[in-house]
A protein has these predicted regions:
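Active-site His/acidic residue clusters
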Residues: 66-84, 104-150
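A substrate-binding/cap region within the structured catalytic cores of diverse enzymes
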Residues: 30-103, 108
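Second-shell loop/turn segments in exported
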Residues: 26-34, 43, 88-93, 105, ...
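Solvent-exposed loop/turn segments at secondary-structure junctions
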Residues: 1, 12-14, 53, 59-64, ...
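Metal-dependent active-site segment of extracytoplasmic phospho-/sulfohydrolases and closely related
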Residues: 143-185, 195
Length: 215
């Protein structure tokens, strides 16, 4: 949850300036209480500019993020037309097969979401249960790869979507071979993650570090 909070807010954990979420379960509160101030998100930006947003997730801890930007806790929309305070239009927590099916339905509709956040829990669940890089973990990687294929194929099959959609694939942590957790910050495998971008305007073969030399 700390790194997912960073993904959607663009902020580090540590305050001041960060989102202040060190815990990995829904504590029943909201991100703004953790930070000590309102924390804007990618959902705020899209929603307040008239777009639609969705979260399709595989763990109940994401209720924390949905609650943080709901109709009660989201900030007033002060950009153009007032679209209300609920920054996340669709929130679904279920297994990956169900959430991916829902996403594919959205992509095929006449009004697909402007922004979709998709969390696939299969690899994480397998890593914690059977060990990272175990046979069960690698099987889960294959399953998730299949889900990604379905999503990318659905976008590529629609010319308008293909021309206007960018996909970012990443994860919130890694995991060392044979280990069941990722708690040791001194182990590079725990914090080494993929960051892949796909879309019409994405430079093929570009290196993330070369593109961001000052980061």
């Amino acid at each position: 949850l700390p790194n997912h909070s960073s993904m959607v807010s663009g902020r580090k954990l540590a305050t001041p300036g960060g989102h202040g979420v060190p815990f990995n379960q829904d504590n029943g509160s909201i991100i703004h209480a953790s930070a000590g101030r309102y924390v804007a998100s990618i959902f705020d930006v899209v929603h307040d500019n008239g777009g639609t947003t969705g979260m399709y997730v595989g763990k109940a801890k994401f209720d924390f993020l949905d609650r943080s930007w709901n109709a009660t806790n989201g900030a007033p929309d002060l950009t153009g037309v007032d679209n209300g305070r609920d920054k996340i239009d669709v929130y679904q927590m279920a297994n990956s097969s169900t959430t991916v099916t829902a996403l594919l339905y959205q992509l095929a509709s006449s009004t697909p979401m402007t922004l979709s956040f998709v969390h696939l829990a299969d690899t994480d669940n397998a890593g914690h249960a059977f060990g990272f890089m175990s046979a069960a973990y690698l099987d889960a990687v294959t399953v998730v790869d299949g889900y990604l294929d379905q999503i990318l194929d659905a976008i590529a099959a629609d010319l308008d979507l293909a021309r206007s959609t960018a996909v970012i694939v990443t994860t919130d942590h890694g995991g060392a071979s044979g280990v069941f957790d990722h708690a040791d910050p001194s182990v590079a495998a725990n914090y080494t993650v993929p960051f892949l971008a796909w879309g019409e305007d994405v430079a093929a073969g570009a290196d993330l570090y070369a593109l961001n030399p000052d980061r």
